[in-house]
Amino acid sequence: MYTADSHGRVWLDEDSFLAPFGHFQKDYDFVINYLRDSSVASRTYFDGFDENVLLQLYGFYLQQGHGWIGFHKKERASFHILETASFVPLVYAVHGGISKKLWGKGSDLCANFIKWFVFEEKDGIKLEGNIFKPNPSLVAYYKRNGMTKDCEIKGRVSVDGKIHSLVIYSMSKEDYLGKPKEEVKEKKKKKRKSKKKKRS
């Protein structure tokens, strides 16, 4: 469904594309400037979790996961990081940020690519999204793109001294494909058998 061009860009529509993250210093500058926007910072940070901690985590996620920088009309407008939350089974957690330039249709185009990459390109079984600090906008974004509340871990986050839960939203491969779980398992078995035959 998605194919990168000779420059590694994955075009989402005529105005927007994703490129591998980190080839240019401006990619990192975009992330820092995005996070320092007061409206973003107020929804992101909490007790013991500041910009320095978050950037260190992003660096770790990129080392063992995947990352893209999003462009809209030749300007950086989003960043997307997939943390490998589990290697066996393969589960990814999505992180990132989307500027106002991509709100609406543009953000959904990015989400569709992320889901395709996780479930079809990498054959992952689950995509997760964490909500540490209460964030209705992020909840709405997850729901709009097919993710549902998976679980709630109480007593994990402190915001101005008030204790909140860590909430995890997720989408399974079955949800993504719109197929029963057993049918998806059977498809994976056939795929593995096909790979073994090619090797032999």
What label would you give each PLM region?
Residues 58-64:
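Short loop/turn motifs at secondary-structure junctions and domain boundaries
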Residues 36-57:
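Conserved GNAT-fold acetyl-CoA-binding loop/helix
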Residues 1-30, 34-35, 65-200:
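Acyl-donor (CoA/ACP) binding surface of acyl/acetyltransferases
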Residues 57-58, 114:
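Generic hydrophobic alpha-helical segments
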